[in-house]
Amino acid sequence: MRIQSLLLLGALLAVGSQPPAAFGRKKGEKSGGCPPDDGPCLLSVPDQCMEDSQCPWTRKCCYKACFRQCVPRVSVKLGSCPEDQLRCLSPMNHLCHKDADCSGKKRCCPSACGRDCRDPARG
């Protein structure tokens, strides 16, 4: 009887010591975000993963070239990118590729002519 009580106590302590999932994340989802999927679509390529838990350590399961694969996760800044109502007449020119390329709270956002660093939209 005493051994069963100790096992039950140990199990409860182990479960209670697990940190809760971060707010807004699904169970098993890793922190960080996916890099932008700017690559061309490769047809008929099977997904390499379906969820983050299938990826090693610091990698996330993200869409890249139109199929899911394990890629290095990127840091995500708060706020959303403002909408761009312009149309580009020149070739695409990316001034950044991910939020970490931008200073301070600025985010790497899609614009009419490529990606550039912008202050996040308020709201």
Swiss-Prot record:
Signal peptide positions (record): 1-24
Keyword Amino-acid biosynthesis among UniProt keywords: no
InterPro entries attached to this UniProt entry: Elafin-like_sf (IPR036645), WAP_dom (IPR008197), WAP_four-disulfide_core (IPR050514)
Record's protein name: WAP four-disulfide core domain protein 5
UniProtKB keywords: Disulfide bond, Protease inhibitor, Repeat, Secreted, Serine protease inhibitor, Signal
Record GO biological process: antibacterial humoral response; innate immune response
Ranges where the WAP domain occurs: 27-73, 74-121
